[in-house]
Amino acid sequence: MTKYALVGDVGGTNARLALCDIASGEISQAKTYSGLDYPSLEAVIRVYLEEHKVEVKDGCIAIACPITGDWVAMTNHTWAFSIAEMKKNLGFSHLEIINDFTAVSMAIPMLKKEHLIQFGGAEPIEGKPIAVYGAGTGLGVAHLVHVDKRWVSLPGEGGHVDFAPNSEEEGIILEILRAEIGHVSAERVLSGPGLVNLYRAIVKADNRLPENLKPKDITERALADSCTDCRRALSLFCVIMGRFGGNLALNLGTFGGVFIAGGIVPRFLEFFKASGFRAAFEDKGRFKEYVHDIPVYLIVHDNPGLLGSGAHLRQTLGHIL
């Protein structure tokens, strides 16, 4: 008889829950719930389990916020809870709460070739460290290493490191944004809101007033080639994505590959392919040759957060991935 675990991927707006076959890791019965409709994460889980008429005793939920102890308070939502208390209330034997990019990193060993699009570099070297990052509402970052037949995710808040300009144009943008918001992290330029910041700074640098555009507007105008400022912003976004990815590659010698997740890049895939992304990734001066062969992949799997939550839980329960 198939034994299932509950897996989830929870952001500031929605909670996506599913079942994971503990033996195979296969994800099924995925359903998305609006976080605004429920008073707590526990309430959503109870509704899901009741709707699917399934009894589970193990679970792993990925959440878009730092996980530093038993008490979890979501960054972009009012939900807050004790892991131990929720585990007890649900009657679970195991309940893991992990960072969303911990989950994405743990999905990587489970991905197939059709889930990846490669951008330069050679073949990955088996057993070498891996980096994963992704722009969405924010900028998530994690690393993954293989130790004693186990995958170990190294989460953190790498999206909040300083934005490091490497051109005159980027330096001007930094100064404009610093005057507006103070500390300018990488996330301030590599995210949906970050794309807006780039557009606004480009226009303001020319002593003009920017329009009140959303990320979707900027992307659409750039792809339609109907707005030079929007196209410059999107081009610069791709270049800075490359610089940041190259930095991750240098940090840990990620010859196992650098992986891009998140919902933004797939929206302009052909533009991204033709952009200065890879050149910026390799633009590391004396260490250009060091990163030259490191492959970069775009993850195109529909639910890497759910897949990775399942992988994390299965490994915790003793399975080898």
Curated annotation (Swiss-Prot):
Task: Give the GO terms filed under biological process for this record.
Answer: glycolytic process
Q: Please give the catalytic activity noted in the UniProt record.
A: D-glucose + ATP = D-glucose 6-phosphate + ADP + H(+)
Record's InterPro entries? ATPase_NBD, Bacterial_glucokinase, Glucokinase
Key word Transmembrane helix present: no
Its EC number is 2.7.1.2
Q: Where is this protein found?
A: Cytoplasm
* Gene3D superfamilies given in the database record: 3.30.420.40, 3.40.367.20
Write out the GO cellular component annotations.
cytosol
What are the recorded GO MF terms, alphabetically? ATP binding; D-glucose binding; glucokinase activity
Where's it mainly located? Answer: cytoplasm
Q: Give binding positions for ATP.
A: G8, D9, V10, G11, G12, T13
In terms of domain of life, where is this protein from? Bacteria
Q: What keywords appear on the UniProt entry?
A: ATP-binding, Cytoplasm, Glycolysis, Kinase, Nucleotide-binding, Transferase
Q: Which family does it belong to?
A: Belongs to the bacterial glucokinase family.
Q: What is this protein called?
A: Glucokinase
Name the source organism: Escherichia coli O7:K1 (strain IAI39 / ExPEC)
